[in-house]
Amino acid sequence: MTCKIDYQPAADLLHGRIILVTGAGDGIGRAAALAFAGHGATVILLGRTIAKLEKVYDEIEAAGGPQPAIFPLNVEGATLKDYHDMAETLDKEFGRLDGLLHNAGMLGRITPFEQYNPELWEQVMQVNINGPIWMTQALLPLLKASPDASVVFTSSSVGRRGRAYWGAYAVSKFATEGFVQVLADEVEHLGTLRVNSLNPGATRTAMRKAAYPGEDPLALRTPEEIMPTYLWLMGPDSQGHNGEPFDAQPPKQG
């Protein structure tokens, strides 16, 4: 796996780019939205909680970034029509999309498969894989309209090597890795669109705390500290990389 945690982006790396971030209200999504805007991008903040999105919007404006846009959407309940309506709105507003970060995710439960609830399984699959792929399908014309577009799907170490009790979350991330390879191969001939996966690694987030309640959060990197790889993937320096798995930080030891 390739990791770009030491990448030093130019201040105007993403100048003029339009980038959509899902799950932009907190955690890694918030950090990515702020980082992208801080390097010149117009960021579309997508999430289900408007108050959180508004707070990130205000933070971007206060920092002097380009005016962002807010798009409230709950991926868990969204339909194909919702995604196509969204694409139509974005087309009218922006005419293209230069970046798409699929960050929104759902952990489900860490439990033996024998005890896994089928309804919860379906929910996790909807948020982590079905929603992102149909959203991507709806947004493909906008991504193809860009001279240089990057799509990043969030993966996980348990989506590259399965581990006991990780259930639907692990399976959804294996599916994510597979879909990235399929779509990347389909768009390879375009030369203007790349699709890659990114494993954030052990990061100080609410999801990490839910998965590892006994872990000391201060021993983990913050979302802000893992942004270099996100910036590298969204910017022009990652051109030529397509269908590849990346890590946002070196693997945690021990």
Label the predicted regions:
Residues 161, 182-193:
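Active-site-adjacent segment of SDR/Rossmann-fold oxidoreductases
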Residues 41-55:
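Conserved glycine-rich Rossmann-like NAD(P)H-binding loop of the short-chain dehydrogenase/reductase
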